[in-house]
Each structure stands twice: as C-alpha cells, then as structure tokens.
Amino acid sequence: MTLARFVLALMLGALPEVVGFDSVLNDSLHHSHRHSPPPGPHYPYYLPTQQRPPRTRPPPPLPRFPRPPRALPAQRPHALQAGHTPRPHPWGCPAGEPWVSVTDFGAPCLRWAEVPPFLERSPPASWAQLRGQRHNFCRSPDGAGRPWCFYGDARGKVDWGYCDCRHGSVRLRGGKNEFEGTVEVYASGVWGTVCSSHWDDSDASVICHQLQLGGKGIAKQTPFSGLGLIPIYWSNVRCRGDEENILLCEKDIWQGGVCPQKMAAAVTCSFSHGPTFPIIRLAGGSSVHEGRVELYHAGQWGTVCDDQWDDADAEVICRQLGLSGIAKAWHQAYFGEGSGPVMLDEVRCTGNELSIEQCPKSSWGEHNCGHKEDAGVSCTPLTDGVIRLAGGKGSHEGRLEVYYRGQWGTVCDDGWTELNTYVVCRQLGFKYGKQASANHFEESTGPIWLDDVSCSGKETRFLQCSRRQWGRHDCSHREDVSIACYPGGEGHRLSLGFPVRLVDGENKKEGRVEVFINGQWGTICDDGWTDKDAAVICRQLGYKGPARARTMAYFGEGKGPIHVDNVKCTGNERSLADCIKQDIGRHNCRHSEDAGVICDYFGKKASGNSNKESLSSVCGLRLLHRRQKRIIGGKNSLRGGWPWQVSLRLKSSHGDGRLLCGATLLSSCWVLTAAHCFKRYGNSTRSYAVRVGDYHTLVPEEFEEEIGVQQIVIHREYRPDRSDYDIALVRLQGPEEQCARFSSHVLPACLPLWRERPQKTASNCYITGWGDTGRAYSRTLQQAAIPLLPKRFCEERYKRRFTGRMLCAGNLHEHKRVDSCQGDSGGPLMCERPGESWVVYGVTSWGYGCGVKDSPGVYTKVSAFVPWIKSVTKL
C-alpha cells in the first residue's frame, strides 16, 4: 500500500486494521524480515494527537504531509547545510543531506578519488569534475539529473548507479535554534521520528556528529502530542557514540505498542568546554572524524586560513570536538572550498590548549586568504590497526607504527616492497612515498607487531595486506620499516596519481618505468619520451638530481599491458598523472619501445689527458663491477661492466652504422677482432668505424663514441676458406694513445701470456656481445658465463679442423646451452685471473650453428698470437 492510499484510507476510516511500518519501508532500514501485524488499536503506524470520532462523510482534502501544530509556526527543521540556507546544491543532494553514500539498491559508493580509468559503462556527463575528491557522497555533477555514484559490482568491475538522496538523513525540528530539536529521520520519502526508549547521550552525540553541530550531544525528549501525525521508525537505539551516522547504530524497527512516556527522541548539541569557546564543526570529510574546519561566529559559519596551520592546531581542534586519536593538519582546501567568510588566520597553537580560542591568532575576520587556503583536520580514532609515521620531522615521515591492544608497535621490513609503501602512504592521505633507510629514524623500544607484510597495491587499508599474526616475527628494531610519504599536489591533496617503479636497472635509481593502474603493473611507450618526462618520474620517486630518458627498451622489455603512450611533461609536474594526455591503455606500441629513466645522473667522460696519466698503463679493470648475471643462454650485461667491449660497424655505402662484428679494446688506439669480419666487405678503412662505450645499439649514450679506422692488419697466415689464424688488429684514428677516451665505461683488456693455457688458470669466463639471442639480435650488450672445454673433446668433435691455435667453450647440455653466434664474431672470450684482472683469452671465430647440442663454439686462442700482437701494436 502506498503512503497516499494509506492516508486516504485513514481519512475515510476505511482501514480494517493498521499496516505495520516495515511493510511500508520495504526493509530500507536494514530490516529484512516481514511481519503480519495484529489488528486493533494497539498497533499504530501513526500516533494521532487525539481520538477521532466516527465520520459520516469524508473530510476536506488534506496535504500529503501534515503541518506541525499551530503552537510551532515559526520553527523550522534544522540540518547541516552551508550557512543553513535551504537551497539545493547543484552538485549533489539537497542542502542539508550530504551523507548519502549508497546507491538506491544498497551498494556502497566508491570514493571519487579511487575510481579507476576503466569503467563498466559510461557514466553521466561532467563527472570528471569530481576526480580527486576524497569523499564518496552521491553527486550530480551536471546539475540536471539524479545524484549517483560509482560502486564495485560482484565481478570486481566498476559501475554506477543512482542514489536515494535523502535516505537515512536526519534533521532537528522544533528547537529554539539549529543546535536542538526533535530528531527526525528520512526514509522511503517520509520524515519520521524515533521512540525515546533507551535514548541517551551516546545516541544524541551521533546525531550531532552527523549534523556536524558540535562535539557532544545531550539526550532530550519531546512529547508526541506536539508533533502531529508522524510515523515512528525506531526504538531502543543503541549507539556507541563514535558512529558516523545513525544508520550504523544498533536499533529496533518500531513494531507498534506503547512508546514509554509517549516521548520522541530529541537532542541538544553542545560543546564540552563551555559557551565561551567558539562553536566548531568539520565539513566536507568522508566521516565525522575529518573535514574542513568551520567556526560559528557572529551568527554565521566561516572557515580558517591555513597560514601556519600544523598538527598542533589540529590537536586542539580534535580536543575541542571531543575526538581522540591521531590529529593531522590538512592544507589548501584539502576537504573542498568552504563558503562564507574566512573567520581566522595565523593560528599558532602549542597543542595543549582546550580550544582554538586560547591559541594565538589573528583577530576575527582579519586575513589575507581565499577559500583555496581553507584549513582542515583529521582526528583518526585509536582503534586496532590504526597506523602512523613516528620519529620524523612531520606526520609524513618516520617509523611505521601500528596501534594494537592499546600500544603502538613497529613493522619488520622482511619482504617489504614498494606496493606496501604505496598502500601505507595512500591510507595516510598521501599520493606516493618511498622506504627510508632503517637507521634514518630513531629505533623504537616498543613491540614489533607485524612481519612479512605483502600488499598487492589494491588495498585501501594496510591491514588488508597479507601478513603474519600479531606479534609473530623474527626481527629486531634495526629492521623497523621507515617511510617518507610525499604529497600528491598542493596541500597534500590526494589525486589520481599512479604508483611508479623502476625495474631491471643496475640500482634503484634507474630502470624501465612501470606504473600501477587498475591493479596491474604496466609499461610506458617511448613515443616522445624525453628528459623532461624522466625528470617528472624521478621527482615522483623522490630523486632531485639530473634525470635522463632512455628509450627502445633500454632496460629490457616489460610484460603485461602498455598503460601509457605519448606522455607530454613540461618537466615541472609533480607526478606522471599530470602529464598524461591520452586515454589509459591507448597506444600503438610494442614492449620493444618501453621507456626508462636514470635518476640522479652525474655521468661524465674522463678527459684525454687524465686518461693518459691514470689509465694508460692499466688493463682488465671493471670499475662498475657490482654483480654477475648469467648471446644464447645469456642475459643483459651490467652497463659499463665490460668496458673493453667494442663493435665494428659498417659505414658509407655498405650501411648506416650497421653492427658487423664484436671486438676487444687493447689500448686507446688498438682493437682486437676476427679476420673473417673483413671477408665480405674487404679491408678498406673507409668502410668501417669502431664504436666504444656502447651498451644499447639504438640509443646514443654519454660514454659512447664512434671512431674512424686508420689501419686494418689481418694475420698473414689467414685464408678466407679456412678458420685457422682467424685474428686481426684494427688501428683507430687519432694521435698515439689518444684515440679512444678512457672512462669507467671505456677501458682496455689485458693480453694473456704467450702460450698460456687458460683451461688450467681461468675458471671464471664470460662471452659478451650483441649477437643472436634465439629470437633476434639483441639491442643491449649480452653476457653469458661459459666453461672452457678440454682440448681433446674439441679435437674429437671437430677433427682436423680444430688446431692448436684454437680453444672451445660452451655448455654441452641442451637445457643449459650457451654459445656465441653470428653477431658476436670477433668479440671477446674473457676470463678472470684469480684476484687480478680480466684477460682476453679468445676471439669468437666459428661453430656448427648456434647453441647446438655437443657443438661448442670455437675461439681463436689469443695466447698463441701474443708475439704477433705486440709486434704490430708495440704494446
């Protein structure tokens, strides 16, 4: 039965029995079972003011909502609204009803700042205006349709739905001012009241919090006789006092009977520290514990300017509102811009005051601010699982501490990842952050609460991450997690930023750029990728030094989606999100175009003079040797890890710098390679160039240099139809000892001793080059560990073709195949003398295919040619 039909039937006296209230509400107030109410006058839905006599004819038509008795003609309902002016808000629910955050079918709304780029279907127009808003209240951004919000459906997709804007809203009616009155609740299109049974100050405080009318509520009662015809919705409301709104309190659906003393619930919203303190409320937050600070002064509400606003000021605001927990200051209209006057400026509390009135500050109304500088606070309750950063210079940095069982404790850094840091900083209201060193902040003395934490990045709360049980760990306080969070824009405002990480670099300051979007890490296409884009990435990660862009999968190809293309940064943005001009996921790229960066880049070439003095007599040093990785069966080498590796390249009519062979730098002016490299194009010096300091063949690099060829010396015994004596020397153009400029990335290799047998002296051997990797020729320098094989095995495999001027190397098992292939011809086989330097024992020469089982690669044995090399080069 609809309400209109019910009222009409009531007026006509046609009801045989009275309908139960829950059948009208359709369980909209979390009441899922249904009743069949007994007949009779003891089960009223409306409480009449007096007994109605029998009617012989219908009365005149009545309005749908009865007016209050004549004794209250000047009194109006009171509810939260900007300045308490009863006008509709163009972006949301009617003024006074800002708390609706569920769809009309009960799905909880997502915060506007957490809506991903990919949606199940297109939402109503103009919603982009709400990007970055932290609340999840229903809104109508175009001002025309019904309010709506985004929600997550059962499949994990994001969809949107309309909201019943006033459902669950409350107001105060019949009081002397807006801070007192009878409590009325809105549901299913009707305002109703609450029976005062068990109504106490905790219940009243929730109403005051919901209406943002003060820090404390005093329970009152109002006779039903003065309310007119109005439904009763609830009885026995049982709030704890810290709920965000009355819908979250335990309560009983009214099922008829007698309400004790026939009294309705009412409240007076007061302030615990007396009338001399200004009235304060928090507005625009997602709960009663946070929001824009607003003061009631001279009959109107106004805001506070954030000049000198800090956590000490927030502490006083939280105390004055009766909100305990962690107090945090927010700046630059973090909770949205207010309206009305700016009441105060230059507030400078010590943190010990009982009220903002006791703090040093400007005079009322004196300021030089606009509403873009409105101050805010959050007062996070101390419940199990609350987190904070302690021991730093502010609430944005310090040891990560978790509150549990009345005590703060730390988190062990075992298995800690960037995603963990992202979840922590996001929960604290920051956009991104990074882990600080363990000794950056003072050690804690409390318990270690958590260990082995692992977050996926999708969590909205830290405790949603997988972890050990409380108190289970194998750590000391030297392993406490420390974090520095960074703002996401002006005033630490959280916006649509994306977590960023660098992958597959040689250290944490470089690598392939990956972004976390829609629950998945993906890469960035290098179309238009410049140093300005790199600067923004490095700034977002907290690095302040020079930044360099890298293209063409310089740090290897990524996996998963390519999230972003055509990034256009000016270099001044705070995060990647500010530079994205193209839809997420839209691109025309492959992973061979993945973008990378190097942060805090201070690379410099050594001068020619300093080289001659300090490095000319040194060979076989790897100045950047920090780690080993395991061409076919190989992996990317360490950049600068093989500084003697050079490449012989074609030029002029034969090709535009195409890679022909690998080679080894023996001195500033001499290079060692294979004789067969000149078999096809001849030995004209004009056809070739040598590139030193190269790592990625398609990306110009700081240490890279291309030098012309002055002389080519092929061993006189070499014959093109044979593989013996496959060795050659190349003289670079330039003055003696000043051809190639030495640096950390350009250094010579050592020659072996004459007739030295590397199988007995060398155990740690590597081949390097840009050759065949099984799919294609590599763009980045490869390296592979390779064992030297006994001479007799090579003689048995290759018969007379294998001579005493050769050696062979490689893994014999197919699943461990390591070999050098076409592109590595002429490149080095390097072995490390124990505790000494790296020696070029072989020059890649020939083999039966690439990585073929039981067919190891064959190398020219350099030790057999040492006298010839020295006679030509004068080394």
UniProtKB/Swiss-Prot annotation:
Catalytic machinery residues: H676, D726, S825
Residues of the Peptidase S1 domain: 631-874
Gene3D superfamilies, A to Z: Plasminogen Kringle 4, SRCR-like domain, Trypsin-like serine proteases
Alphabetized PROSITE patterns for the sequence: KRINGLE_1, KRINGLE_2, SRCR_1, SRCR_2, TRYPSIN_DOM, TRYPSIN_HIS, TRYPSIN_SER
Main location as per UniProt: secreted
Keywords linked to the UniProt accession: Disulfide bond, Glycoprotein, Hydrolase, Kringle, Protease, Repeat, Secreted, Serine protease, Signal
Signal peptide start-end: 1-20
Cross-referenced InterPro entries: Kringle (IPR000001), Kringle-like (IPR013806), Kringle_CS (IPR018056), Kringle_sf (IPR038178), Peptidase_S1_PA (IPR009003), Peptidase_S1_PA_chymotrypsin (IPR043504), Peptidase_S1A (IPR001314), SRCR (IPR001190)
Glycosylation: residue positions: N26, N683
Site keyed Reactive bond homolog: positions: R630, I631
Ranges of compositional bias, category Low complexity: 43-53
Sequence segments annotated as region (Zymogen activation region): 619-630
One Pfam family, short name: Kringle
Positions of region (Disordered): 29-88
Domain Kringle: 93-165
Subcellular compartments: Secreted
Top-level EC class: hydrolase
Similarity-based family: Belongs to the peptidase S1 family.
GO process terms (BP): exocytosis; proteolysis
Function: Plays a role in neuronal plasticity and the proteolytic action may subserve structural reorganizations associated with learning and memory operations.
UniProt domain SRCR: residue ranges: 170-271, 280-381, 387-487, 500-601
Recorded GO MF terms: serine-type endopeptidase activity
Disulfide bonds: C93-C165, C109-C149, C138-C163, C195-C259, C208-C269, C239-C249, C305-C369, C318-C379, C349-C359, C412-C475, C425-C485, C455-C465, C525-C589, C538-C599, C569-C579, C619-C750, C661-C677, C765-C831, C794-C808, C821-C850
Chain intervals with Pro residues compositional bias: 56-71
Full protein name: Neurotrypsin
